[in-house]
């Protein structure tokens, strides 16, 4: 083998990289175990322990525990539990604001029509709007709509329609970016470990958010869907406010000493970072960690009695700026509780508002201290004197000293009020507040007129960029609405972990046994070693990408292992052929690797093509599956073709392993000299296939498919009851209350206690409270089959599994459903086209392409037909959803592997025996590759059966589709693709001979 040195170096470097990234997972698990041991079952204390070490350097003196947790392999929502949502910024609302909410009839009608068409069209709202407006108002320029004050520097009366459309796209993109920045900030404050938020570039206005471990979905819904609220406030100085805080501390001493504390008010006097919780365990925890003695702990308790507020709030009595105090983030909630008491509020000025800074104090190396700002409310209505809707633009730049700064422009009204505000506060600070948190409080040097300002300070470039984003978010014209949602409870996630691990282990063991049984112990173990390396490298690469491992991802990894065996099977089968030809082991093995390379390369590349299409058209779990599948295939190519070759070359260079036969007693002569007449009955095979396709089409046309909410829109609720229930009983209960809405109920699992309820009830309605109202309505409807002590709070608690509760839920809005349906069709069509083109390029004969695409189309129709025939009869769900489309594409990728290997042998035989009859040549090609075809199919079926039986309900339908794909894909390679290619070549040759005879 050439380039052995490069392969060795690459393998060593890849191993080191994978060890490095995987090591973070071991570090975090070590400290998680210590936290569990310390907490002794108290979840809160366990979390406090981990939080106390979050900014401590725990790994090689360079990485904090927080950084290690960010670098570890994260678990997806279906394994860890949590919430996945897709939010959509209303593009029509943005356009309305940009047009200054014009009442023009043509404008409003065009916009309404565009919004309606966007749910089914592949064109975006802007394209549809422009088209409709030109229909309704022929010759009317767009500039007359958008030459507004807000767009005065971008659109004039002389702007062309193309220029206006470009500006609209830029403004909509900016609005989505603003929403993205607001959501990112809100999520960071929520304290979620390893959140994932990304703007879906191919879908205008949509943002995907994944929040592992979330236990309060209703709170998250409100957090994500709220409008951004940017405000500019006047401020107090710390020196002015300190006396009031001293009075509050004195008042609290009496309250805390009292046996009946004053009733706590529900106030927003100071909003804490959401990660903070009212707890007094932080101090005792710190003492335990630092080894403080009981006397010190007792002294601290006495101080907290005498100075309840100042024991946890460090004041800044002589400060000239608006920062009045500092506190550890663990204490902020308790401080809020104190400051919100009516008795304490009575000690404060009526115009004083205390708000926390959004970021930790910059001089705290542990990043655990937050600043408390004193805001002055000077308006009679209690609102801010200036709000973010007046900000026209903001950008980060550098001042004339070369330091990071932020420039900001306001509209005419904002410029006038800004001039007045800055004039009244020269020498003082103005706080920039978003969603109740202070982002910056720059000092006013002089009156600012004209509406253009520059904010300077000790900014880093990143901080300047963040502040510019905050200022831009103030003009967010429309809030984001949830159009798709998945919520998975933690125990359901644990069940998925157990099922995934079990299916993976069993599949790996059976594959290892199979390889040793078919090719002998040493060759089998070499192939098995490649599988283990494949697993190690795949996990390492996933960890380096900070990709989340999902159940679909595990399925992709397991399937990649099954497909990885294909390369070893090809190499070993070719080696056996060379041995039968009388070659020595060294020469036979070298030729086996060389002759198998093109087939391995082509089959892997076609699978990667389908994986890329799957990644581009899928979201969430489907992308996770595609990611692990692509990585697994790439790694399997490296390990099977190069790593195993290094092993054999090393030992054979020392004249060892020269007695290998690459077979066992079972497989020694298995299909070695078969001579099936495949081509002799090609018309029979094609007739049978055609009949099967017609039957499947008939079922699809009459019975149809069971479409999931991915394609119809709606909500799924997976509900677990205390006792066994009948799905029909649940369906009747819900149908009686949900009116004309579609309702379906199916059993999940075998214990009869879990059902999945699907309905499109009120799915087209929008609003922050719709989801909560439907959950409450579902609770009232199911009360007769719930235990008597179950409350609404218990019923919607994903962690509760006693008495009956929702353990997971899913929502897909109508616009998302239409997009998924269109994307699914395009993904399958593009996969067939891409594979057809690739086969044409590689094999230089259209007969191969037509044969392959025709066979793949038959595979797809027959799988769809099987689902149409079987749904309602099988003891598991056969709904058509995104996962099913993933299975179809994966089956296409797998099926083409067989066809590529067979056509590769046909091409090889054409070169070796150019005068041999095509009929015999095709038969010989099919017979010589039959062992490989059957071995690969069996090894892949072993994996799929493990997933199907042990992988859990969530992945069973996927495995079933893949099993059908492997079976029909194997048959179509032998009885559809090859006969069609043969007949096309035969007809072409006959045509050429006819032309020659003329």
Segments (PLM) and residue ranges:
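Juxtamembrane "pre-transmembrane" interface segments
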Residues: 210, 451-454, 462-509, 777, ...
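Hydrophobic alpha-helical transmembrane segments of membrane transport and translocation systems
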Residues: 8, 12, 533, 538-541, ...
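Pore- and gate-forming transmembrane helices of large, multi-pass membrane proteins
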Residues: 183, 491-511, 563, 567, ...
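Cytosolic juxtamembrane regions of multi-pass inner-membrane proteins
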Residues: 562-606, 647-657, 868, 874-936, ...
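Interfacial helix-loop-helix hairpins and adjacent transmembrane helices
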Residues: 1-17, 21, 25-69, 73, ...
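Juxtamembrane segments of multi-pass membrane proteins
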Residues: 698-746
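Hydrophobic transmembrane alpha-helices and their membrane-interface caps
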Residues: 517, 521-571, 849-908, 975
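Non-transmembrane, solvent-exposed regions of membrane trafficking/translocation machinery
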Residues: 23-31, 51-56, 60, 68-435, ...
């Amino acid at each position: 083998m050439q380039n052995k040195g490069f392969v060795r170096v690459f393998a060593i470097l890849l191993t080191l990289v994978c060890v490095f990234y995987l090591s973070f997972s071991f570090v975090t698990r070590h400290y998680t175990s210590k936290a569990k041991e310390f907490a002794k079952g108290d979840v809160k204390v366990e979390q406090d322990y981990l939080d106390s070490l979050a900014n401590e350097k725990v790994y090689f003196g360079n990485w904090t525990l927080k950084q290690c947790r960010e670098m570890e392999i994260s678990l997806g929502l279906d394994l860890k539990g949590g919430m996945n949502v897709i939010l959509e910024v209303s593009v029509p609302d943005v356009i309305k604001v940009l047009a200054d909410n014009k009442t023009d009839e043509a404008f409003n009608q065009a916009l309404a029509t565009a919004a309606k068409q966007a749910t089914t069209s592949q064109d975006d709202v802007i394209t549809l709007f422009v088209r409709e407006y030109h229909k309704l108002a022929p010759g009317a320029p767009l500039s007359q709509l958008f030459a507004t004050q807000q767009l005065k520097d971008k659109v004039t009366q002389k702007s062309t329609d193309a220029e206006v459309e470009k500006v609209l796209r830029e403004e909509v993109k900016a609005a989505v970016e603003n929403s993205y920045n607001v959501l990112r900030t809100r999520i960071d404050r929520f304290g979620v470990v390893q959140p994932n938020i990304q703007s879906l570039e191919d879908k205008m206005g949509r943002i995907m958010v994944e929040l592992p471990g979330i236990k309060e979905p209703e709170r998250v819904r409100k957090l994500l869907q709220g409008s951004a609220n940017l405000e500019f406030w006047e401020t107090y100085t710390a020196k002015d406010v300190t006396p009031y805080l001293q009075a509050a501390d004195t008042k609290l001493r009496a309250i805390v000493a009292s046996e009946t504390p004053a009733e706590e008010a529900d106030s927003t006097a100071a909003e804490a970072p959401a990660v903070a919780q009212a707890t007094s365990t932080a101090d005792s925890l710190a003492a335990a960690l630092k080894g403080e003695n009981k006397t010190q702990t007792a002294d601290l308790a006495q101080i907290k009695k005498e100075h309840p507020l100042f024991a946890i709030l460090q004041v800044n009595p002589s400060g000239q700026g608006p920062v009045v105090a500092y506190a550890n983030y663990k204490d902020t909630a308790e401080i809020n509780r104190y400051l919100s008491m009516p008795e304490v509020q009575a000690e404060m000025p009526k115009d004083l508002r205390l708000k926390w800074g959004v970021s930790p104090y910059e001089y705290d190396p542990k990043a655990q201290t937050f600043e408390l700002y004193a805001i002055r409310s000077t308006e009679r209505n209690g609102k801010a004197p200036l709000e973010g809707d007046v900000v026209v633009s903001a950008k980060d730049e550098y001042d004339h000293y070369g330091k990071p700064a932020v420039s900001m422009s306001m509209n005419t009204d904002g410029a006038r009020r800004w001039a007045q505000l800055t004039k009244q506060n020269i020498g003082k600070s103005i706080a920039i507040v978003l969603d109740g948190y202070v982002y910056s409080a720059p000092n006013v040097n002089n009156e600012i007129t004209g509406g253009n300002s520059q904010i300077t300070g000790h900014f880093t470039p990143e901080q300047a960029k963040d502040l510019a984003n905050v200022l831009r978010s103030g003009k967010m014209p429309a809030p984001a609405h949830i159009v798709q949602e998945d919520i998975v409870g933690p125990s359901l996630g644990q069940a998925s972990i157990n099922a995934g691990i079990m299916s993976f282990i069993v599949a790996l063991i059976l594959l290892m046994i199979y390889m040793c049984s078919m090719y002998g112990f040493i060759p089998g173990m070499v192939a098995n070693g490649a599988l283990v390396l494949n697993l190690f490298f795949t996990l390492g690469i996933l960890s380096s990408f900070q990709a989340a491992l999902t159940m679909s991802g595990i399925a992709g990894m397991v399937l990649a292992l099954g497909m990885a065996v294909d390369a070893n099977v090809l190499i070993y089968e070719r080696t056996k052929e060379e041995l039968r030809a009388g070659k020595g082991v060294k020469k036979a093995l070298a030729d086996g690797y060389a002759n198998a390379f093109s087939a391995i390369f082509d089959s892997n590349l076609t699978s990667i093509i389908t994986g890329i299409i799957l990644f581009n058209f899928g979201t969430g779990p489907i992308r996770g599956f595609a990611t692990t599948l692509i990585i697994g295939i790439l790694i399997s190519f490296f390990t099977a073709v190069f790593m195993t070759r290094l092993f054999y070359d090393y030992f054979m260079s020392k004249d060892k392993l020269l007695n290998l036969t690459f077979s066992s007693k079972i497989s020694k002569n298995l299909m070695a000299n078969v001579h099936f007449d495949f081509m002799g009955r090609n018309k029979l095979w094609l007739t049978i296939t055609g009949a099967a396709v017609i039957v499947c089409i008939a079922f699809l046309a009459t019975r149809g498919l069971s479409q999931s909410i991915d394609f119809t829109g709606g909500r799924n609720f997976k509900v677990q009851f205390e006792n066994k229930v009948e799905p029909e009983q649940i369906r009747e209960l819900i149908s009686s209350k949900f009116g004309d809405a579609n309702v379906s109920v199916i059993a999940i699992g075998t214990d009869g206690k879990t059902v999945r309820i699907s309905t499109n009830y009120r799915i087209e309605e929008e609003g922050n409270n719709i989801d909560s109202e439907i959950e409450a309505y579902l609770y009232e409807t199911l009360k007769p089959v719930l235990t008597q002590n179950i409350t609404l709070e218990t019923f919607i608690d994903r962690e509760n599994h006693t008495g009956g509760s929702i353990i997971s839920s899913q929502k897909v809005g109508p616009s998302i459903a239409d997009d998924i349906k269109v994307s699914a069709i395009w993904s399958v069509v593009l996969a067939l086209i891409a594979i057809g083109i690739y086969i044409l390029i590689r094999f230089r004969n259209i007969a191969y392409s037509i044969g392959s695409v025709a066979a793949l189309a038959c595979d797809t129709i027959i799988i769809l037909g099987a689902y149409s025939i079987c749904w309602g009869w099988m003891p598991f769900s056969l709904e058509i959803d995104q996962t099913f489309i993933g299975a179809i594409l994966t089956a296409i990728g797998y099926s083409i592997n067989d066809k590529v290997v067979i056509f590769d042998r046909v091409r090889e035989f054409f070169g070796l025996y150019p005068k041999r009859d095509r009929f015999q040549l095709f038969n010989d090609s099919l017979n010589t590759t039959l062992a490989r075809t059957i071995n690969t199919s069996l090894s892949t079926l072993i994996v799929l059966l493990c997933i199907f039986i042990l992988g859990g309900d969530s992945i069973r339908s996927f495995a079933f589709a893949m099993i059908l794909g492997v079976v029909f894909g194997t048959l179509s390679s032998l009885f559809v693709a090859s006969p069609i290619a043969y007949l096309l070549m035969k007809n072409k040759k006959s045509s050429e001979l006819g032309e020659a005879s003329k």
